[in-house]
Amino acid sequence: EDVKEELKNYRYIYVWTGNDYLVYQSNPDYRKYNMQKYLYRLSADFQQILNIYEIPNWITQMAFIDDKIYISTKNVYPKKDGDRVIGISSDDYGIYYSTDYFEWRKLDFEGYDLIEFRNQLFVGNNLCFNDDVIKILYETYSGYPKYKVGQYLCEIDYRNEYKTDNNTVLAFSNDGIYWAYMIVDKANIQGISELGDEILIQKDYRNYYACNKEEVFSQLREKLPNNPVYVKFNDDILGFDEPPIIEDGSTLVPMRFLFEQMGADVEWDSETQTATATLDNKAVTFSIDNVNARINNKPAKMDVPARLINGKTMVPLRFLSENMGYDVDWDDDNRTAIIK
């Protein structure tokens, strides 16, 4: 009965599982930093505590994928000046998962921002599969996805080049890899949500701006690929600013970010639209819209030429990678080019 009374406290978050509720404390109590923490299972009618589970630490976020529950945790403890509490500190961040709520396994990764999207778990700039963590290397995107709006992940991008003191840049993605940006002529935005046919942009606890959801989604469908191609480089996923495309069976990717990962130097002649990439003792020269190339100053021919798309030089992935000394495989099921 004491626990049932405690769960009436406003500091608890209730998560509906489809049959009952999982309940955890939303505002960690620093006074209990060295005590056992718990997760509660509550009946659908709120009348019965079905189970009490021990958890590794205070829960900050929760997600369900297939038969697993994932929790983001942290420890909160008092910061003291002598015997006087002068603040609150937190540390020991971790991501755990369980299939039975009793035994928890920790991901070998230090992080705390998690979100489930399309049955995948994103932790910061990482994609997690059970015990495996795949890092996403973004070309310029610098945020962590925190919101879900319809079929899109969303984030407030504070470091975007178009951010000013008088606006807010919102980043949207339909896969967590490639992002499109929308500028909102409002400053100090605190959060994003949706209600019916509208997207709500929260300025503070009382004030919201509303915009038509379908108008926003229509713009995003034009900017983001519907059937994207992915690139893995040394087991990391590359989050290009301009998503790769396929032309006549060849994958074209943004030149500069790919070569940066390889450690290659690139020289660009804007007058002739010709690039030369150099890595160790290898040099490849090619031009926009021209299948003729040179490898170590010897003539060669590409299956498709490099293209200039939305200001990005897009180059044939296999030709450039293999001539830089890398192997390229194609995962047809996941539409992924794998460079090693």
Go through each PLM region and give its residues.
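Blade-level signature of beta-propeller repeat domains, shared across WD40, Kelch, NHL, RCC1
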Residues: Q190-E222
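A short beta-strand motif characteristic of beta-propeller blades
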Residues: D2-E5, Q48-Y53, W104-L107, I134-Y138, ...
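A detector of repeated loop/turn-to-beta-strand junctions in beta-rich toroidal repeat architectures
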Residues: N34-Q36, S90-D92, N166-N167
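Short beta-strand elements that form the blades of beta-propeller/WD-repeat-like
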Residues: R11-V15, D20-S26, R31-K32, K68-T73, ...
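Primary recognition of N-terminal secretory signal peptides and signal-anchoring hydrophobic helices
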Residues: F217-K340
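Short coil turn/linker residues within repeat-based beta-strand modules
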Residues: F46, Y101-E103, V133, G176-Y178, ...
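Conserved Ser/Thr-centered positions that define the repeating blades of beta-propeller domains
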Residues: L42-S43, S98, N130, S173, ...
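Repeated scaffold domains used in trafficking and secretory/extracellular systems
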Residues: V3-T17, P56-D66, F109-N119, T140-G150, ...
